[in-house]
Amino acid sequence: MQMINTVNESALVAELTELYMKYEAALCSNNTAVLDEFFWDSADVVRFGLKENQYGAEDIRVFRNSRPGFKLEREIINLKVVTFGQDSAAVTLEFRRFINGEQRFGRQSQMWMRFSEGWKVVSAHVSFL
């Protein structure tokens, strides 16, 4: 078994933070094509949403494309990127959104893995407090 002996290598944290901010921009503008590129194209990818669960890339695509075309803007309160070795990372986020004039706080967690085609989200969860 190969042990992970590098945590939070600064160059990887910067790379993943930059990628995450591109993901966030795509999410907030509801750019589904870009969002699809960030997720692992596999039947094994999982996304737990606010009111729904998706199992597999196709379920995630169907969900994203069925949402109304409104913007999902939110304020990032706390973003944490932790890398493990050269090829895996956890990205966690606390955020604030206004929905129908009501302030809501939420959180999101994602596991990212590096594949030959680049970094991909392999598991994601989002919820409100």
Which residues does each PLM region occupy?
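Short beta-strand edge/turn micro-motifs at domain boundaries
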Residues: F105-L129
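A solvent-exposed, acidic/Ser-Thr-rich amphipathic alpha-helical stretch
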Residues: V13, T32-G85, N100-Q103
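C-terminal-biased regions
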Residues: I4-N5, I76, V121
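Short, low-complexity N-terminal intrinsically disordered segments enriched in polar/charged residues
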Residues: M1-F38, N53
